[in-house]
Amino acid sequence: MDFAAFVAKKEADAARRSRSGAERISRARPAGAMAIGNDWTRRLFDGDFYVSPPTGDRPSTSVVFVQSKDGNTGATNPSALGGGETDKHVIYEGLSRVAADAVMAGAGTIRGGKIVLSVWHPELVELRASLGLPRHPIQIVATLRGLPFEESLILNVPELPVILVTIPTWAALMTPI
């Protein structure tokens, strides 16, 4: 599957997964936080999503950790971890990435897979554009064992910026001759 087909499939899947709002949670705006959202995300998330803006010369970071009811912290299908497809498209692949300059994952997440860490629902793609950001965030992949470049979509899309974080031994092995 080429990158254009991958993007079209992900966007179509996200568009089909619109759901009604999740369980209502009362949340106050954290001090100094920046509100992110549009009418669509506010309806599904029940309000704004808040992120900490960068301060001084330090970047802003957001970390998404998930845990299933049985205590599992990893899954091949993120929608299996709690809120189903709404959580997957609105939070996991949505609001947590929409304002990001970069998204980071471990090599196990992308190794041999057809994955790009981005937003896919048309409303989120539009929100990202309204924030003045490029279509896809920079992809950061951390690995201690290296990656087979030919097996990972994320490493084979010239217009997709990728930063690979590894140890010197593997950096030397992955450098083209």
Language-model-detected regions and their locations in the chain:
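Active-site ligand-binding patch in enzyme domains
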Residues: D2-K69, T73-I177
